[in-house]
Amino acid sequence: MSPAALRLSSRMSSQFTIEQIREAAQSASVAGIIHAQIETKLERRTRELKPFLELTVRDLTGSLVVRVWQDHPCFAFCGELPAGACIALEGEFVLGTTFGLEPKNWSIRSLNSEERQVLFTGSPESQELQQRAYAEIERTVAAIADPRLRRVSELFLDEFGERFRRAAGARSVHHARRGGLVQHVAQMLKTATALTSVYSYLNRDLLLAGVLFHDAGKLWENAFPKEGFQMPYDLLGELVGHITIGAELVNRLWTKMRREPIYESWKNVKPESELVRWHLLHLVAAHHGEKQFGSPVEPKTPEAIALHFIDNLDAKLEIMTGAYRTGHRLSADIIERVRPLPGHLVEPLPVYVQGEESQS
């Protein structure tokens, strides 16, 4: 194959994330470049038994399926690309009725080492967003008054912060992306802080620590590798699930905290340290709300109830905002149902802006 067939076209195209392409393509075709990693490569055949390739490519924001037909100039080149390869894909992206979002008149090349590093760390904008979210978590942990809950939270961030930063909030549905768990937890901490100012009887320190630890088991169940967007299946996560792992992690870090000299100075602090640990374990165990949804026990304290609904609220709103951006529109104001939401979505009412009243 000639190098010209593999070279990106000379036209000037902007670089986008897959989510940006998907959102813009809702209304018109989009010419642009995406940098992504090949998640899977499947060899398939048409009804006429002609071979074609089906590449699933992924970046920090989402995934896209690229079908490489036998007569495409890049068919042979794509056939040599392994799963895990990092590529630049340039073309016109359109939202079709048969295959959904797909590129037309496209070309492809491998990323160089610098581009590959940026792909996994994200653009400066996405890095700043992630750094702000993690800084919010650190600030909130530092403000926890109960020394036991603050210290066990600090131990978690110290030991598992790097893994935390690349974990997803879920394998699908909500915050299902590299770094999604940090964004989920940071947003939940803001909500929990606001809620405790309204319901003053809530134990603020316990609720904040519960938010931090509620999905800590997903550092194993939903962890991405250091370089990659393909989430592997973890044996421990599959065998026991993130709730059990999270509870075990709390116990492990609490045991580590007990060995520190400062722990002895807390022996007369009320409430007793063991009772604090039990309540934190309850929040982790009960945060799914009902046994049918995976919790071994249902919420039995105000903080456990609050955590369950804060978690559910953030997940549902994340799903909805994503659907408003990229969901299939049945009309200008109605978006097709996205599970697990109960039905079609309706475009939200715009916020009233003073001074924009009709002059008629």
What role is predicted for each listed range?
Residues 2-38:
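OB-fold nucleic-acid-binding modules
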Residues 308, 325-326, 330-360:
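N-terminal intrinsically disordered, cationic/polar leader segments
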Residues 173, 197-329:
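Divalent metal-dependent catalytic cores for phosphoryl transfer on phosphate-bearing substrates
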Residues 54-59, 224:
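Short, acidic/hydrophobic/Gly-rich beta-strand patch recurrent on exposed beta strands
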